[in-house]
Swiss-Prot record:
Keywords: Cell cycle, Cell division, Centromere, Chromosome, Kinetochore, Mitosis
Top-level taxon of origin: Eukaryota
Family as reported in the entry's similarity comment: Belongs to the ZWILCH family.
Name this polypeptide is given: Protein zwilch homolog
Organism of this sequence: Xenopus laevis
Function, in words: Essential component of the mitotic checkpoint, which prevents cells from prematurely exiting mitosis. Required for the assembly of the dynein-dynactin and mad1-mad2 complexes onto kinetochores.
Cellular localisation: Chromosome, Centromere, Kinetochore
One of the protein's GO biological processes: protein localization to kinetochore
Subunit structure: Component of the RZZ complex composed of kntc1/rod, zw10 and zwilch.
One of the record's GO cellular component terms: RZZ complex
Pfam families documented for this protein: Zwilch
């Protein structure tokens, strides 16, 4: 029996070592098959969500699980059409993580532990023990305790020598809304004391609240693709489900995706969206023109703009500008009824920017763009208009306007991609100035901080990407301002964090921005709500001798490889509200240590 155990331990050690080397060399990301029905993943800490609350912070770890079954069968559909022809359909089951029996999982951890024991010289032929990343095994809750994870991690000395092994056992019960079934904090402390013979213990609390889910605000910017949660951490837990004290350390987690119809900056998003259509068309040669809501054609709108400029030259009073200004105010008011818009319409639009505003809402074809620019260039050549433009504008049209001041204009061939590029350029110029006006106007950034994002010295496609980053930053700040009513003292560091991230990383709307915040600032959003996650850690010992017992409640299933029977929930029972109940999954993580010497 011992020989068989030793052989199994060596086999597992060799397999895990081989897998780790392949991952380090980036030869494969797995999963790696071990035996017929077992596979292993190598993941970075934080990339396996079900383990986020249980891991100790290792950079890399193994996850061992049962190989999932994939079914792909041809199924005869008995239904026949009018001609009597049978149809065949193919069904493929999406693989889900699979657990192994708890007893077998313990055997794998035994093998893993044996190979790390420096006293087992017969397993390593006298060679130094090779330290492997921690091993976690998915369990099927088949034991009486309901074990869903088993983990093992080597304990190393300051000289990087293995001195023992740390084990973690994660148990989980099915969902319940009956708080009377929860253990008391005293009983958890007593169990920890008896398990670890500890006389001195400290407690640390953690709670996470969903700030979008716990309140309903009419016409707010709440959107399912976006989320704002807050994490609280505090010492000295007093009871189970304790409300985080105001002295807690709190951190906002903000993930925002653009395109929410209720966002105060939705009109800006639509403008950016058209800019992206042009950029894609310039790159591929194919443009997917959006539908226009204008009753007048693009050429008619541009002609009206030119006539307005001519009338100004002739000293006539313009009615067009008044109507446009009224429409701008009306549009701004329509964006948001109950939340004051964070961004205001600029009043210093130059000719190129006004041209962009009309063309982006009305052009529906390549020929529209050509015809509009033909009108403008002809009016400039004939000296019919003398429009003003902002200093520093870098678009081709701005350069033509500057040349028209001196009566000498270069000829422009409105063929190929030239008209598309000209339109994209004036759109980029306009939107850059919009974002500058917003961030500097709200005293959230200086021009020097924004210079990277508005630079015209890079390729035009890169300019578009940087403008996308500016818009995402604006969406993040607006959500916190409009929905959470955060003031400048919080919006300023949030903006700086966004600027720093996007100077170093590509555009990514899945990124979660974090902002430390005083609990009192957001207390009205969570104090009458239920936490998504609530956790208490009971800790004793120090350094490598530290042991911890964790007891946690989550509103979502804590593991993805075990199914739980969901209890019948009354119709009026929801997950938020002052006097409403919530269904929780209780989970406990126990720790133990074994010394090798």
């Amino acid at each position: 029996m011992w020989a068989e155990r030793h052989r199994a331990a060596v086999e597992l050690q060799q397999f895990l070592s081989s897998v780790y080397e392949q991952v380090k060399k980036e030869e494969s990301l797995g999963p790696f098959q071990f035996k017929d029905d077992i596979q292993v993943h190598v993941v970075c800490d934080g990339h396996c969500k079900p383990l986020e609350s249980f891991c100790s912070g290792s950079e890399v770890l193994y996850i061992l699980e049962k190989k999932p079954l994939t079914l792909e069968d041809n199924v005869l559909d008995e239904t026949e059409n009018n001609e009597g022809i049978s149809f065949y359909t193919s069904l493929q089951e999406i693989p889900q993580p699979q657990a192994i029996p708890t007893m077998r999982a313990r055997q794998f951890l035994t093998s893993y532990t044996l190979t790390h024991n420096p006293n087992m010289v017969q397993l390593n032929s006298g060679a130094p023990v090779k330290v492997l990343p921690p091993l976690w095994v998915r369990c099927d809750c088949s034991d009486a305790e309901g074990t869903c994870w088993l983990g093992a991690e080597p304990i190393k000395s300051s000289r990087n020598e293995i001195t023992g092994m740390s084990f973690r056992t994660v148990t989980c019960a099915g969902p319940t809304a009956d708080k009377s079934t929860f253990p008391s904090l005293d009983s958890l402390r007593q169990a920890h004391k008896e398990r670890h013979y500890s006389s001195v213990m400290q407690t640390r609390g953690f709670a996470q609240y969903d700030l979008f889910g716990c309140n309903t605000v009419e016409n707010s910017v709440i959107e399912s693709q976006s989320s704002v949660t807050v994490d609280f951490v505090w010492n000295g837990v007093e009871r189970i489900l304790q409300l985080p004290p105001l002295a807690s350390a709190a951190t906002l987690n903000i993930k925002v995706e653009s395109g929410d119809l209720r966002s105060p900056v939705y009109s800006v998003y639509k403008e950016l969206d058209f800019l992206l259509v042009l950029a894609e068309g310039l790159k591929t040669g194919v443009t997917e023109w959006p539908e226009t809501g204008e009753t007048k054609s693009a050429v008619d709108l541009v002609q009206l703009l030119l006539n307005d400029l001519k009338n100004k030259v002739d000293g006539l009073t313009s009615s067009v500008s008044k109507k446009d200004n009224e429409k701008i105010k009306s549009d701004t008011a329509a964006v948001d009824c109950s939340i004051q818009s964070f961004i205001t319409e600029r009043g210093d639009l130059d000719f190129a920017e006004m041209l962009w505003c009309r063309m982006r809402k009305s052009v529906s074809s390549y020929q529209d763009v050509v015809n509009c620019f033909s009108l403008v260039i002809q009016s400039l050549k004939n000296g019919e208009v003398h429009p003003w433009i902002h200093r520093g504008s870098s678009s081709a049209l701005s350069k033509l306007i500057q040349q028209s001041y001196h009566g000498k204009m270069q000829s422009v061939s409105l063929t190929g991609l030239t008209p598309m590029r000209m339109l994209l350029e004036i759109g980029l110029d306009k939107m850059k100035k919009d974002y500058i006006s917003c961030f500097i106007g709200q005293d959230l950034a200086t021009f020097n901080y924004l210079d990277y994002f508005i630079s015209s010295s890079v390729d035009i496609q890169e300019q578009v990407q940087r403008v996308k980053k500016l818009h995402h930053m604006l969406e993040v700040v607006v959500v916190c301002n409009a929905f959470l009513s955060l003031g400048h003292e919080n919006l300023f560091p949030l903006t700086q964090s966004c600027l720093k991230y996007y100077k170093e990383n590509p555009w990514n709307e899945q990124h979660v921005f974090q902002l430390p915040i005083r609990p009192s600032v957001i207390s009205t959003f969570y104090q009458n709500s239920h936490p998504q996650t609530w956790r208490v850690e009971i800790i004793s010992g120090h350094g490598q001798k530290e042991v911890k017992t964790t007891w946690q409640l989550t509103s979502r299933r804590p593991v993805d490889h075990v199914s739980f029977a969901v209890p019948d929930v009354p119709i009026d029972m929801t997950i938020s509200g002052e006097n409403e109940e919530i269904v929780y999954y209780p989970t406990q993580v126990s720790c133990s240590q074994v010394n090798f010497c």
